[in-house]
């Protein structure tokens, strides 16, 4: 991307891309994506930087110690002159509003929130699951909770639920116990629990009470997280945007969205919910233009070009 907002190349490279502490950093995958997008722009990725500024909005950049660690790792590759690191939640927020501040909530495999006040103050959360006090932690939690509800319905510890049938059917087995055993013996990758999130929404749409309870629990955690950021930044009496991004928000469950809207508006009546309809990479690119003090016309051009430019060479 040039400073005037022209898109010089775009790529979606599907690979493990979480920089969580304790995992091997996926620098090679990131480097491959940079190499491919640079090639589209006619730039050779070698020992020389390919751009003046690199704005990296990365999953796993959750704590200040993560910011320092990942920045060192990325700087070591000499891809760009100036490395600017943000959590991926900031890309969601920037892609969804041009105010320059507000609240961004991402709910995909996990749940996280970042908020920026009109004075530039920032609130963010560790988003480390139970370790950081999180309760209903995104789509991964919803999938695991669905399996738990199915098991409890079967053995009598909980109410009967259509998940008793729908969960095993999704994995082409007869009983939820078979799913549990496959997870226990590592025959089934635990990441596949994410596949159950849409199943829960489908069951709730069909009137399943237990599925609706789980969805409400997730909505309430989203509300609690967003409202905590709103209160800490003293936004309760202001007008601002709350941007909702991530796979969980790409559903057609009106009750889920309404519950979140009502819960946040009870604390901040001037908050407007905006479901993100642009790729989060738009937010990262706009943050880069913000850092370069680009003109508004450049940012408008970037939005328009990325809206009509497919992410090439998808894998």
Kindly give the residue locations of the regions a language model identified.
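ATP-binding/phosphotransfer module of carbohydrate and carboxylate kinases, centering on a glycine-rich
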Residues: 1-45, 49-51, 75-76, 95-101, ...
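Alpha-helical substrate-recognition element adjacent to the catalytic core
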Residues: 29, 57-62
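Conserved helix-loop-beta element of the AMP-binding
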Residues: 53-55
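Solvent-exposed beta-strand sheet faces enriched in polar/charged residues
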Residues: 57, 86, 241-245
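Phosphate-binding/catalytic loop of phosphoryl-transfer enzymes
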Residues: 61-165, 311-315
